[in-house]
């Protein structure tokens, strides 16, 4: 059995990424919940960075909610032009409209943009699915 960190060991600052983290199905959100819980129980500082739907995490785990067009939950043609305000949103929509796997790619771009100015805040950045070339 693994014990909590001893006094001579410093806790790690860990970022866990999930482009889609439903707390009820699909696996990624459930995996992030249990992994973050156990890492926190070991004494580490844990941040989960996720796109919608967002996971349900235990108290003490920080959640960074990165927005998206949530194209798996919405009808593609229900998206209003005013929602496609930036280059990233337009590319995400066009990719989905042409059969691309848009959501993981767009999440990777958003996660990279969020992480770059904060790299020194983390010792480990773990992308569970590594579907994002931006990471």
Stretch-by-stretch model annotation:
Residues 127-131:
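Short His-centered aromatic/hydrophobic patch
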Residues 1-68, 116-120:
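N-terminal subdomain of nucleotide-sugar transferases
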Residues 11, 38, 48-115:
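A conserved catalytic-core segment of Leloir-type glycosyltransferases
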């Amino acid at each position: 059995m693994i014990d909590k960190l001893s006094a001579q060991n410093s806790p790690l600052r860990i970022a866990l990424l999930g482009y889609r983290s439903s707390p009820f199905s699909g696996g990624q959100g459930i995996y992030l919940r249990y992994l973050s819980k156990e890492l926190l129980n070991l004494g580490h500082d844990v941040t989960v960075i996720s796109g919608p739907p967002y996971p349900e995490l235990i108290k003490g785990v920080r959640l960074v909610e990165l927005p998206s067009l949530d194209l798996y939950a919405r009808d593609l043609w229900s998206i209003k032009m005013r929602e496609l305000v930036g280059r990233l949103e337009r590319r995400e929509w066009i990719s989905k409209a042409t059969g691309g796997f848009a959501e993981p790619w767009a999440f990777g771009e958003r996660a990279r943009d969020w992480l770059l100015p904060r790299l020194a805040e983390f010792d480990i950045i773990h992308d569970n699915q590594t579907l994002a070339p931006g990471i």
